[in-house]
Amino acid sequence: MNLAIPNPNSHHLSFLIQNSSFIGNRRFADGNRLRFLSGGNRKPCSFSGKIKAKTKDLVLGNPSVSVEKGKYSYDVESLINKLSSLPPRGSIARCLDIFKNKLSLNDFALVFKEFAGRGDWQRSLRLFKYMQRQIWCKPNEHIYTIMISLLGREGLLDKCLEVFDEMPSQGVSRSVFSYTALINAYGRNGRYETSLELLDRMKNEKISPSILTYNTVINACARGGLDWEGLLGLFAEMRHEGIQPDIVTYNTLLSACAIRGLGDEAEMVFRTMNDGGIVPDLTTYSHLVETFGKLRRLEKVCDLLGEMASGGSLPDITSYNVLLEAYAKSGSIKEAMGVFHQMQAAGCTPNANTYSVLLNLFGQSGRYDDVRQLFLEMKSSNTDPDAATYNILIEVFGEGGYFKEVVTLFHDMVEENIEPDMETYEGIIFACGKGGLHEDARKILQYMTANDIVPSSKAYTGVIEAFGQAALYEEALVAFNTMHEVGSNPSIETFHSLLYSFARGGLVKESEAILSRLVDSGIPRNRDTFNAQIEAYKQGGKFEEAVKTYVDMEKSRCDPDERTLEAVLSVYSFARLVDECREQFEEMKASDILPSIMCYCMMLAVYGKTERWDDVNELLEEMLSNRVSNIHQVIGQMIKGDYDDDSNWQIVEYVLDKLNSEGCGLGIRFYNALLDALWWLGQKERAARVLNEATKRGLFPELFRKNKLVWSVDVHRMSEGGMYTALSVWLNDINDMLLKGDLPQLAVVVSVRGQLEKSSAARESPIAKAAFSFLQDHVSSSFSFTGWNGGRIMCQRSQLKQLLSTKEPTSEESENKNLVALANSPIFAAGTRASTSSDTNHSGNPTQRRTRTKKELAGSTA
């Protein structure tokens, strides 16, 4: 009977390299300075014999775990599958009967390696014990080495030692491989003293350690906390024995320097390494950067690289990239560009990763022009960008608010035949969602489908967000339901995206239905969930339910954030609850929260509605004197009319562009609040101008629609003042078209969307009632609610033409040729109407009165 004996050199070495970890990540004590010429000292340790094993869970047979087809020979594959399905007390002998004399020890070694990869030490040990009792498959040293390594990796040191001690009695000689496996087992489990003793023991047995043995011991001692002198002693010892250190040896020492913060020692190790002709790799440079980064001396790495280049040893691109990444993490643009220029001067050509690091650094610093310039430079230098480069650009411009530029990058990427990955799609669709680019989001989703790519949950969330920003509720809901069909489970972010979409439009019933699905899916409600519900109830005119949701939020111990407080303030402002608005506003400031520009506008609006001009002027002065936020100052000055001329209006446009970069969600809240304030302060012409700025930036895409049959204005997502502004602009536009002889068959005002519009109850919505009243005041009774839709207010062409031709304009309207006068009225000077104690009701504890108000609102009926 012939047994195929494996080549011990190749098999032992490959297995130990696969299962040894030379570079540790432990906390060490500080060491002394590097002295390569000294042998160093280490204290002898007493060998403790058997050590108690760590408790390990039993791995039971699992027939479903089968080996990959074609990975091994048929017999080896069959044996592995049989052993895998063997129950805990199943017979190993019966499994092996049909394989007797068919399998070599090489084949058995493959079986042990397969189970080692699974961490199945119990099954391996049972097979090993069975083989020890057989003649035809008695384990050789290779299998003993595999077994020791497997048990060591599982922390079973007593069993490791038991297997090792059995070798002589089983007629198996120990060699450097079995000793190294045992040394590694103790070392990786923190027993470096035992590893050192085993090293001495193998020498006493005339077994010469290999480079792998010394690397294992040095790594174990470095991780275990042996002092620096001891590590150098091992280093000197191996060199004394004629064993030349390799890249692993030096990297292990550099790792110890990095963790201990030994800068001078790291420098000397690196120099010795270069002098020995060892080429540094990525790990080498990473340890150097980590070491000197901790010491705030990254410039030292630059010096070392410069010395290498001047000495004729040109550092590779990896070294510079690691250093660039270190500077990028600290946001050091100047130093990073210095490294970039240094590598170019040294003749080292930047690669895609180099540019990616710099592009991300510029992007995170908001230097978008530099990002564009660097990307053009990258292309002109014949350095081809890869998917990772484009992903960084997409993320940078998406976060910066350059949403259309992100879509352009995607088209550029496709033209360059660079395959997008899921991160690419997620980044693009996220930008489309944030920017409300629903058509682009739809096209990218179709592109993915056409290429058999299943969108991730994050990608679907972006699509839903894009549809929601454009008030395309049906499409958003279809996308949400499609997720289930393709097996992509909605995340809490997906639910919130849909909730906020419905909330902005006041679609209360739809919002409640999605909330119910969220709860049914087992996802707990959090702050965003409550915030969306408060906004939905507010926009839908359900003020009592909005406040009740806020009370429920506090009861559930979910801490409100700034957006929560803003949402509650908007409820009070919409409901004209002045005292509650004031208390909410003052509590925000008392909590060291700077109220957002939206909050200031809400306060101005509610003061304007109730003609509290002293409070208006006081609040405007507070905005103008704000030293924390330039936005507050600019908007305050704009409201007062300081920026009306075109040259100064550019300042307003700059602020609006900055806000636009935050996405449509913030934009809708901002413009609604600002338009409300402008309208109620009598700044109607400025309100119309601001509304135009909003639509130019893609906000409220549903607002104005025209075709040959219908002209519509959709105000269901607008504040009261925003709605009045939009209706005024729309009516004046109709009037202009009449003068040109062009009128539609129908003029329609959309005041309510969603399920509610199917009911006549939609007419009781605050926005619907206010819109209808406004139309009655300005164009008599020609507009009326339709019978088929409770949220539509409509006028036929014949009535519209007759109405516009017979309406008597006011002098102001006649002068401007407008149907609705849009002018800026002077804001009343201070003292015109002082706020009295009875008006503001400052007395009493604000918190107690707030709680009382919540209970009263929540307990009342609509």
Curated annotation (Swiss-Prot):
One of its GO terms (cellular component) is chloroplast nucleoid. Signal peptide: none annotated. It comes from the Eukaryota. PPR repeats lie at residues 104-139, 140-174, 175-209, 210-245, 246-280, 281-315, 316-350, 351-385, 386-420, 421-455, 456-490, 491-525, 526-560, 561-595, 596-630. Residues 831-862 are annotated as: Disordered. GO terms for biological process: plastid transcription; positive regulation of DNA-templated transcription. Residues 1-66 form a transit peptide. Disruption phenotype: Lethal without exogenous carbon sources. Decrease of total chlorophyll content as well as a decrease in the chlorophyll a:b ratio. Unequally expanded grana thylakoids. Altered expression profiles of plastid genes. Pfam families: PPR (PF01535), PPR_2 (PF13041), PPR_3 (PF13812). Residues 713-801 form the Smr domain. It is found in: Plastid, Chloroplast. The keyword Flavoprotein does not apply. Residues 833-848 have a biased composition (Polar residues). Its main location: plastid. Mostly expressed in leaves, stems and flowers, but barely in roots. Belongs to the PPR family. P subfamily. Involved in plastid gene expression. PANTHER family: MEMBRANE-ASSOCIATED SALT-INDUCIBLE PROTEIN-LIKE, OS03G0201400 PROTEIN. This is Pentatricopeptide repeat-containing protein At1g74850, chloroplastic. It comes from Arabidopsis thaliana. The lineage of its organism: Eukaryota, Viridiplantae, Streptophyta, Embryophyta, Tracheophyta.
